[in-house]
From Swiss-Prot:
This is Alpha-2-macroglobulin. Belongs to the protease inhibitor I39 (alpha-2-macroglobulin) family. Bacterial alpha-2-macroglobulin subfamily. There is a cross-link at C919-Q922 (Isoglutamyl cysteine thioester (Cys-Gln)). It comes from Thermotoga maritima (strain ATCC 43589 / DSM 3109 / JCM 10099 / NBRC 100826 / MSB8). Keywords: Protease inhibitor, Signal, Thioester bond. Residues 1-23 form the signal peptide. InterPro entries: A2M/Complement_sys, A2M_N_BRD, Alpha-macroglob_thiol-ester_cl, Alpha-macroglobulin_TED, Bact_MG10, Ig-like_fold, Macroglobln_a2, MG2. The keyword Signal applies. Protects the bacterial cell from peptidases. It comes from the Bacteria. One of its GO terms (molecular function) is endopeptidase inhibitor activity. GO terms for cellular component: extracellular space.
Length: 1536
């Protein structure tokens, strides 16, 4: 029996417990004469087995169409057998069917009553025939034999596809028939015998044509260009050869299966083609699929798109050997090297050694921190535990001078002894009472056979078996239907195998296939011996990617066969696959052979004209080979190290190694009836299906993805280079990267191919490497540094100079440093600088000079303002004179005089395009008006790129239901879907390709979710739909775009004066604003041209609503621009007279001029725009309808030695408590009770003579029942706490006292304690409490109040903050905490269901270089569609994939896929900030983790929150200053 069936049956038996007792037919429905019809009964009484003999016609009708077949017609006849069975435990019964023919059987409960229920049904064939088949994608070979082992010649085989007869064939000699027509079911007739079964055709077969497809590298970032090359091959005369000139179509699909690229190519004369696709910066990350269509065939390839950061150095871990014996020392060597081969000296290495036993969970063995030596090496020795068997894994986190981290792991195998115990079968199936025999090999680790005694044990029995010449036979007889674990030990070594005693036996471990050799050549004749303990009949398949031959076999004991190895095999492995039967049941056996192929691959060389290059040099590559064309590319070695992928090997692609055959070989599969509504099988069928995740997305590429992105990942890409006389030369400029590039070349001719690799090292004997942040903020003080590398063989006097721009000043010391550098060494210098003023274009230059050697690097280091930009904006439709006041301290200003709205549209479009965020609405609002503007003749810069970026993001954000929401996650929104679909329509109308799959899904969504806006959009697409009946005035607005009647109805809601007009209409949807509705109204007016004067006034209204570069939001701006473009109004104008403070000047239409602070008076006629940008330096928190707070927490790693694991403790920055140690403790056992709801069901617990009858969340005391939250006792008092009340029962006085308006209650040594609104009551004393207190955590002696993220300790008349919360605190003395369910203040994970002792020190929680910090932002208030922005310090490396460690996690516990479960809709990490987008505030905080990569004083702008689509709500925190490093302590009691 195959493992899949075995696992399925085990699953059945486990699942049966869901439904109580059960009964079902077991084993196969094809039976041989006198073989028992088998069924199982467990925990059921009076189950009746009924058996009917039926006709061939009824059998075929029933098995082909069981859902339609009327089984009651069979059941009304008298059965040939009927008997009742019962069993209290699992028991298998058998009823013999002697005569050949067809049978129907049922298992029925309550037979003969009105409660009769059919539990299971089945159809059976009793036959003396058996069948075995082998198949690939092109053919199937079917062997038919009888129960005596004779193969049946002349049997009629009827072939069916989807229950329809498609052909009839007959078996030939040896009972075999070869069939090329595809079918799924067959029916055999031979004399009076019949057989029925199903088959599968496999995916294997001869690949007569292959496509080799390669991209220049395996991974890309959004905005990169993907280069690809394809080569088609055809199989001729046993070899693959290049194809001829032909045509192919290449299609590329994004992660949502939307087509984003399609192109047709004409190949060269060898069947080669190449192309490229530019990814926009909005391209979704994940796995992209490539389809290549050629000649009716379709090929699939993939590439990965990720927001990665390329590492600058690599970490390698070596061991002195791969296999160890317990007790030995594992000697690890950690090598840290830059990609140019130079060592990373003095790199900090945090290391963790974990042990993973073969059984059980892994645990921490050893940890520490050290530094690499001058050669970039760190040596570490770890002794393995005695008797341990499993693996040891070293995990390292390395940081260099830049403080960017790289991680690496290395595992080794550890054996308990120099002994290897190898059962030939790890999983054995049998039936209760039937003995199994398992052959076991016992050798040393080198494979030498051992002698001695093997100890076996199972449950309570232990025995020994003799091992002779490395072999032993272990026998075991299961007694019950269950699984058994058989332990095997020899010396210190041990292992196990499993016996599943639920069904028939499987392959005996004594069945052996012995080929004369495991290495063959095409055309060889191979001698194969088969050994078996008894009589065997079956088929030997010669298979690999296809079925080459099948050989029928029938023998007793042994047989010798001669097997011909196929001459035209293109695979490097061949398999001997045996399928058959012996006395124990079915046999499956597979042997793998190596095939020595003589392929048509030739040699190739890549020669560089130098061993090493300097950045910017010209390099020449020479390629030598006897092929015609070469595909050549050079990729940064860091890419391959980061991804862990190598360029594909062409020879192995054409002539592959095979681990398993791609063919099918086995017995036919059989039918099962699922026709009883109440049958157990139907209940199982209703259980949820197993789900699998298979999009290969590596959502959390590990933190190896670090360091800089300044230089190209692909240095050279030449898809097709011709060779002349076997040689080609290429010259190119070497990139500025100091690294190594891997050169890969594939060579192609008609019948010869080649591949080779080489390395190009880019380095210098003397060079420097700056360590700078990505930006600074005004007033930041930071230590910047640069490392100089001297790779010469002599000592050098070095001068290292930093040249700073005017806006960055040096605080101490000289800008030039002088030092001596030893040969082959590195040296780092540090400068403390301060950012004085803002500048986007500031550059820092480093120059190093050592005698006649030098290097210089200039890097941009922008300085941002420590301020928020504000805007004063006015539009005036001037016809006369107007005066206003211009604010001071502005950074830019202008007044502009216009006679056309086009400049306004152009400016707003540009601001829309440059808007920094990218939800669905903002993406749509960028390119939708851009498309319409371009169609109206307005020039839009980079329109193609804008559209491509927008389409890619919209494809990625479309939901599975076809709709769009605000972001990728969350629910689909009707308005947003309409908005996107309207924009896609106009994009198509403008001549751009839009993925058909996206449109179809969107249309389907609009059909299922009718709306007024959707009705108009469906009309655009010409889709028939039911007319939408307006439910509000806002519906009329959208319907007016396609209905003149709806427009006329809107006239009832128009408000107007001489200059402007607007619709007094509102929508309940917060996404639809008044400006937006009036913009749609203007579009309808422009379309129907019924009310020209009203059209002019609505245009004026919208222009006057413009209060900045935007109309309130990106969405409103987009809608207004669309309306203005359709209305395109004209305005009369004159010369504009301007008086600004003491300045007087005139402007003509189209002219503009800057302004000065003070009054501004303008007079004339036309459109006047005034725009002033000024700065506002935040000094304190602001709260206008919303509240926001920001907190910082430092991570401490705490080792739980008893559990051998590490947990993260995040505690607040500042003066406080530093956690130092943690370990689990046992609860002290007392008579006192502490009971939470649902701990007990229907249980009575007595306390001091008082019975407490507990049932779930209810307790009965003295005849009264209470629904409780908690029950506690102390010193004879019983506390029952329930909603807003507490009850104290005194067992001595027999009295009950009730307390009302209680938030929480507990006990101290002095008596009960009650938390009430605003105070805590201790005896008669009322103590006011902080606002965020939610509960009590008092000990017997200390008042502890539980806050949201801290505990308040009442001491000496005031509250002290403690950096933890706990459900229950047993002890606290100011340093030692004993509690359960502890969560540290900044941690997101609770140490659940355990009591821990944590020891704290009182001291400063300071941020040091390299520390891990968590920023938590908490938001309160009402609002929707909010943006939360937090401005990060300039020294922060945000660890976007950081996973906090709780007691269930280990250091390297990464998940490559996790579903989105955050309360907010989306998050974006940018250079200077982290932004969060929340549709609603149904969560109140978010956090992110960062690493401090530099020392200094860092100024943080306030975190802020504001709505995206409305005004009036706003909040920001206080600004903060972070002091990082020992040299930057400000002396305050807390920080920030």
């Amino acid at each position: 029996m195959g493992m899949k069936r075995l696992i399925f049956l085990v699953f059945l038996l486990i699942s049966f417990s869901l439904f109580g007792g059960y009964a079902y037919f077991s084993r196969y429905p094809v039976l041989h004469p006198d073989e028992g019809l088998s069924f199982v009964i467990s925990d059921l009484e009076n189950i009746t087995l009924n058996v009917w003999k039926i006709s061939e016609e009824d059998f075929l009708k029933a098995v082909f169409d069981p859902e339609s077949f009327n089984f009651s017609l069979l059941e009304i006849t008298r059965p040939i057998y009927s008997k009742k069975f019962s069993s209290e435990e699992w028991k298998e019964f058998s009823f013999p069917l002697k005569d050949r023919g067809f049978y129907f059987a049922t298992l029925v409960s309550n037979e003969g009553t009105v409660f009769r229920r059919v539990i299971d049904r089945s159809l059976f064939i009793v036959t003396d025939l058996e069948a075995i088949y082998f198949s690939d994608s092109e053919k199937l070979r079917l062997h038919v034999f009888d129960s005596d082992g004779d193969f049946v010649e002349g049997a009629e085989v009827l072939l069916f596809e989807d229950s329809k007869l498609i052909d009839r064939v007959f078996t030939g000699k040896d009972g075999v028939v070869s069939i090329t027509k595809h079918f799924d079911t067959f029916y055999i007739r031979y004399g009076d015998s019949r057989f029925f079964g199903g088959v599968y055709f496999s995916g294997g077969g001869l690949e007569r044509e292959k496509l080799f497809f390669v991209t220049d590298r395996p991974i890309y970032k959004p905005s990169d260009t993907v280069h690809f090359r394809g080569q088609i091959f055809s199989f001729e005369e046993g070899l693959y050869k290049a194809f001829e000139k032909t045509k192919v179509t290449v299609s590329i699909f994004d992660t949502k299966k939307n087509e984003v690229y399609r192109s047709e190519f004409e190949t060269d004369e060898l069947g080669g083609f190449s192309g490229s696709m530019k990814l926009p910066d909005t391209a979704s990350v994940g796995l992209y699929k490539v389809n290549v269509d050629h000649g009716g065939r379709r090929y699939y390839e993939y590439f990965l798109v990720e927001e990665y950061r390329k590492p600058e150095y690599k970490v390698e871990i070596e061991t002195d050997k791969d296999v160890y014996i317990s007790g030995e020392v594992v000697n690890y060597l950690v090598r840290v090297k830059y990609f140019n081969g130079q060592p990373v000296a003095k790199a900090q290495v945090a290391y963790y050694v974990r042990a993973f036993p073969e059984e059980g969970s892994g645990y921490l063995v050893y940890r520490g921190t050290d530094f690499t030596d001058e050669e970039g090496n760190l040596r570490l020795g770890v002794k393995t535990e005695e008797g341990f068997q499993g693996s040891y894994r070293l995990e390292v986190i390395v940081t260099d001078e830049s403080q960017r981290q790289i991680e690496e792991t290395r595992s080794v195998k550890v054996y308990a002894d120099n002994v290897l115990i190898s059962p030939l079968d790890r999983y054995v199936s049998t039936s209760p009472g039937k003995q199994v025999r398992v052959k076991v090999k016992v050798t040393d680790l080198s494979g030498n056979p051992l002698n001695g005694l093997l100890t076996t044990s199972s449950e309570d029995s232990t025995s020994t078996v003799a091992v002779e010449n490395g072999e032993a036979i272990v026998t075991f007889t299961p007694k019950e239907p269950k699984s058994y674990r058989i332990e095997l030990s020899f010396g210190k070594a041990n292992t196990h195998f499993y016996v599943y005693a639920y069904c028939g036996a499987g392959t005996s471990s004594e069945f052996v296939i012995n080929p004369a050799t495991n290495t063959v050549k095409p055309g060889d004749e191979l001698s194969v011996q088969i050994l078996a303990p008894g009589k065997v009949m079956g088929v030997l398949g010669i298979v690999s990617n296809r079925v080459y031959d099948t050989i029928p076999v029938s023998f007793t004991g042994s047989v010798n066969l001669r097997v011909r190895i196929p001459k035209d095999i293109p695979e490097k492995n061949l398999f001997i696959s045996f399928v058959g039967l012996d006395d124990n049941g079915r046999i499956y056996k597979l042997e793998r052979l190596n095939v020595l192929l003589d392929t048509n691959f030739t040699t190739m060389k890549i020669l560089f004209d130098k061993d090493q290059y300097e950045p910017g040099e010209m390099a020449q590559i020479t390629i030598e080979s006897n092929v015609d064309r070469v595909c050549l590319f050079l990729v940064d070695e860091a890419i391959y190290a980061m991804v862990g992928a190598e360029p594909p090997v062409l020879e192995n692609f054409l002539y592959p190694y095979m681990n398993y055959p791609r063919t099918r070989g086995g017995f036919p599969h059989y039918w099962r009836l699922y026709v009883s509504r109440n049958s157990f099988r139907n209940k199982l069928a209703s259980l949820p299906e197993e789900k699998t995740f298979a999009d290969f997305k590596q959502n959390a590429l590990p933190s190896k993805l670090n360091v800089r992105e300044y230089f190209p990942d692909t240095a050279l890409w030449i898809p097709s280079l011709k060779l002349h006389n076997g040689t080609a030369r290429v010259s190119f400029k070497v990139p500025d990267s100091i690294t190594s590039f891997r050169a890969t070349a594939y060579g192609f001719s008609k019948d010869r191919f080649s591949q080779t690799e080489s390395e190009m090292v880019v380095s210098k004997k003397f060079y420097l490497m700056p360590h700078l942040p990505s930006f600074l903020r005004e007033s930041d003080v930071i230590k910047i540094s640069a490392t100089v590398f001297n790779r010469t063989s002599k000592t050098l006097p070095v001068q290292l100079t930093v040249e700073l721009p005017e806006n960055i000043e040096l605080l101490e010391g000289s800008s030039s440093r002088h030092f001596l550098m030893e040969a082959n060494s590195s040296h780092t210098e540090t400068w403390t600088v301060k950012a004085v003023s803002a500048s986007e274009g500031s550059f820092v230059k480093f120059v190093a000079v050592g005698e006649d050697l030098n290097d210089a690097v200039s890097m941009r280091l922008p300085v941002e303002r420590f301020a928020f930009e504000r805007e004063f904006y006015r539009i005036m439709l001037l016809d006369g004179k107007e005066t206003l006041e211009i604010p001071g301290q502005f950074i830019s200003s202008r007044i502009r005089f216009l006679d056309s709205i086009v400049p306004l549209v152009e400016d707003s479009l540009k601001r829309l395009i440059d808007f920094p965020y990218g939800c669905v609405e903002q993406t749509m609002s960028r390119f939708f008006p851009a498309v319409v503007a371009a169609s109206a003749g307005i020039e839009v810069e980079n329109l193609e790129e804008i559209i491509q970026r927008g389409l890619f993001k919209l494809y990625s954000y479309q939901h599975n239901d076809g709709g769009w929401g605000w972001f990728r996650f969350g629910e689909s929104d009707d308005f947003m879907t309409c908005y996107v679909m309207e924009g896609l329509y106009f994009t198509m109308k403008a001549g751009y390709d839009v993925a058909e799959s996206v449109l179809q899904r969107g249309i389907e969504y609009l059909r299922k979710h009718p709306s007024a806006y959707g009705s108009y959009v469906l009309d655009l697409y010409g889709v028939n739909h039911e007319p939408f009946k307006p439910e509000s005035e806002a519906d009329l607005v959208f319907l007016s775009l396609s209905s003149k009647e709806a427009l006329k109805q809107l006239m009832n809601y128009v408000v107007q004066d001489e200059q402007k007009a607007y619709l007094n209409v509102y929508s309940n949807n917060p996404l639809i604003s008044e400006i937006q509705l009036n913009s749609v109204f203007l579009r309808a007016l422009a379309k129907w041209k019924e009310f020209p004067e009203l059209e002019r006034k609505v245009t004026n209204y919208l222009l006057l609503k413009k209060d900045s570069a935007f109309w309130t939001s990106t969405k409103d701006t987009s809608f207004v621009i669309l309306a203005l473009l359709e209305a395109m109004p004209e305005y009369a104008s004159t010369t504009l007279k301007v008086i600004n403070s003491e300045n007087t000047f005139e402007l003509k239409p189209g002219e503009e001029r800057s302004l000065v602070p003070g009054s501004l008076t303008v007079s004339g006629k036309g459109i006047v725009e005034v725009e002033v940008v000024y700065i506002e330096v935040p000094k304190e928190a602001v709260s206008e309808g919303l509240e926001i707070k920001r907190e910082f927490y430092k991570r401490y790693e705490l080792l739980i030695e008893e559990n051998k694991m590490i947990v993260d403790a995040f505690v607040p920055i500042g003066r406080g408590y530093v956690p130092r140690s943690i370990h689990p403790v046992e609860k002290e056992q007392t008579e006192e009770l502490y009971i939470l709801p649902y701990k007990y069901w229907k249980k009575t617990i007595e306390y001091r003579g008082v019975p407490l009858e507990i049932n779930g969340a209810e307790v009965k005391i003295k005849g009264e029942t209470y629904t409780f939250f908690r029950i506690e006792t102390f010193n004879g008092l019983i506390l029952v706490f329930f909603r807003n009340e507490a009850l104290i029962y005194d067992t001595e006085k027999n009295t009950i006292t009730r307390y009302l308006d209680v938030t929480d209650a507990g006990f101290m040594r002095s008596g009960p304690v009650f938390l009430m609104k605003g105070f805590v009551l201790v005896g008669d004393e009322k103590i006011p409490v902080p606002e965020d207190v939610t509960g009590l955590s008092c000990t017997m002696d200390e008042i502890l109040l539980r806050g949201e993220n801290k505990t308040y300790w009442y001491r000496n008349g005031e509250f002290v903050d403690l950096p933890f919360v706990a459900r229950r605190v047993f002890f606290w003395d100011g340093k030692k905490l004993v509690a359960e369910n502890i969560r540290f203040s900044g941690s997101s994970k609770t140490l659940r269901n355990r009591v821990f002792e944590v020891v704290f020190d009182v001291g400063d929680v300071k941020i040091e270089l390299g520390d891990i910090i968590k920023t938590v932002v908490r938001v309160k208030g009402d609002g929707n569609y909010l943006i939360v922005e937090d401005f990060i310090p300039s020294c922060a490396q945000v660890l976007s994939n950081y996973r906090e460690k709780g007691i269930e996690e280990n250091k390297f516990s990464y998940s490559w896929y996790s579903s989105w479960n955050a309360w907010y809709s989306g998050r974006e990490i940018r250079t200077d900030r982290v932004a969060l987008f929340a549709r609603y505030l149904y969560g109140n905080s978010f956090d992110y983790v960062w690493r401090a990569t530099a020392e200094g004083v860092f100024h943080l702008l306030p975190a802020r929150v504001y709505p995206m689509y409305s005004r009036g709500l706003y909040a920001h925190t206080d600004p903060d200053v972070l002091f990082i490093g020992a040299d930057f302590i400000d002396g305050r009691d807390d920080q920030p």
